[in-house]
């Protein structure tokens, strides 16, 4: 096999490998990040569906609510998950119908609804979290831990660069 093409698995999902010149390094990095993120997300979605009969958005909502035991305002959930309130409402409606969450009016502003996990919601999330961690760890098991730590730091640098770039607009 030609060394430029890599392994068969790589050639089917490694869109950036065809871009070789250094002038396109930024684009190659972005495409590699996107490819890896999509591959991980696809596996997590499949596993959540198969093992827990749930979806990634439902898992994400439960996990975000869990970060604030006093409850998360609907608007804050939307902001954290980067979706509109219109997308969040039906999702929370379904979670409430399944008794995984409850909505309570804010003590400070009764127009604001705080979403809290029920005991059933906590139990469901507690079952999913270690499995999610295992799935992601399994996907990254062949990356040397020191290199993974470097990658984490580099991605932090990238995030900082993006935030500075956005602030400069």
Task: Name what the model sees in each region.
Residues 1-4, 164-169:
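C-terminal effector-binding regulatory domain of bacterial HTH transcription factors
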Residues 1-52:
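N-terminal leader segment of winged-helix/HTH proteins
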Residues 2-17, 93-153:
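Charged, amphipathic alpha-helical coiled-coil/dimerization segments
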Residues 38, 42-84, 168:
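N-terminal helix-turn-helix DNA-binding core of bacterial DNA-binding proteins
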């Amino acid at each position: 096999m030609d060394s430029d093409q890599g392994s068969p698995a790589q050639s089917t999902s490694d869109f950036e490998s065809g871009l070789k010149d250094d002038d396109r390094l930024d684009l190659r990095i972005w495409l590699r990040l996107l490819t890896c993120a999509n591959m991980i997300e696809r596996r997590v979605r499949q596993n959540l569906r198969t093992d827990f009969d749930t979806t990634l958005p439902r898992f994400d909502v439960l996990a975000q609510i869990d970060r604030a035991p006093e409850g998360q305002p609907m608007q804050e959930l939307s902001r954290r998950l980067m979706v509109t309130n219109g997308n969040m409402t039906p999702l929370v409606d379904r979670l409430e119908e399944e008794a995984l969450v409850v909505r309570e009016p804010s003590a400070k502003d009764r127009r604001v609804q705080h979403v809290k996990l029920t005991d059933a919601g906590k139990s469901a999330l507690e079952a999913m979290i270690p499995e999610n961690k295992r799935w992601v760890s399994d996907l990254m098991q062949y990356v040397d831990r020191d290199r993974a730590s470097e990658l984490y730091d580099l991605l932090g640098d990238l995030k900082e660069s993006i935030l500075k770039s956005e602030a400069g607009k």
